Amino acid sequence: HDSVTGEISPAYLFVGVLSCSSFVYAELCRDMKSENFILCHVHAYEYFGGVTRLLVPDNLKAGVTKNTRYETSIPRAYQEMADYYDTAIVPARPKAPDDKPNAEASVKFATTWILAAVRNRRFFSFEEARDTVAEKLELLNDRPFKARKGCRRSAYEEEEREFMHPLPPAPYEPAIWRSAKVQNDYTIPDGLNRYSVPCDLIGECVDIRLTRDTVEIYFHGGRVASQVRLKKAQRDAVMEPGHMPE
C-alpha cells in the first residue's frame, strides 16, 4: 500500500523447490518479466549453494515461448542462463502436473504457507514485504516434517546437496535480447539511449544483448560492438570513433 495515496501495487512470488528434499527458495518480485525471472534463478542457486542438473519450469512466458507435443521453444535469455550454469531446461507439459508431482505439491504448499503467513499484514514498501517473505522462507525450511524426522533444510544437507553441480566462480548477470534495424546515423536504441555500431551495418537487422552495464551488438551470430551502458538518458548518441565512415 502507498502510505499517502492508499494505492495497492501488485507483487509476484517466485518459488523454486528441489524435488528430493523439498528444500524451498522463494522471493518476492515487482514483476515476473524475463530479467527478474532469471535473476530469481540466480538467487536460488546461490541460496542452495549449488546448481540442479535439470530445470523444470512452468509454462510462463519468461520461461517458455512454445511448448507443444512436437516443439519446445525456450527464450534466448533463459537458455543463456541455463548454459552458463550447465543445466538443462525441460519444461513441464501444459496441464501435466505428473511431470513433477513432488515439486508441484511442494510449490503449492510453500506458496500457500508463505502467503497465509503474511495475508493479514499491510505493507507500506516493497522492501518490507520482500524482507518478510525472506523471513518466512527460513521458517518454512526449518519447519519439522510431520511424517519423518528432520526438516527441509536438514533433508537437503543430508540427501541432496552432494548431487548438486558446483556454482561457477561468479553469478550469472541477466541479459535481455532484442532485435533492431540500424538507423541511418548507424545507431541502435537500448530503450533509453542510442549507441553506434559499425557504419557498414546501416539498414541491417542486428541482435542487441543488454545487461545492466553493457550494450553488445551481434550480427549473424558474431559480436560487432560493445559499449558501456549509460544509466541516465542523454541527448546525443554514444558514438565510437571506429564506427564512423572514413
What residue ranges belong to the model's regions?
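Mobile-element integrase/transposase regions
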Residues: 1-24, 32-36, 173-189
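Short conserved beta-strand segments at catalytic cores or DNA/RNA-binding microdomains
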Residues: 8-22, 56, 81, 110, ...
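Active-site beta-loop-alpha junctions of metal-dependent nucleic acid enzymes
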Residues: 9, 26-50, 231-237
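Acidic/histidine-rich, metal-coordinating catalytic segments
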Residues: 51-70
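RNase H-like two-metal-ion nuclease catalytic core shared by retroviral integrases
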Residues: 57, 68-69, 89-112, 126-129
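Two-metal-ion acidic nuclease core segments, chiefly of the RNase H-like superfamily
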Residues: 71-89
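Active-site-proximal acidic segments at structured loop/helix or strand boundaries
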Residues: 107-209
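Protein C-terminal end segments and domain termini
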Residues: 212-246
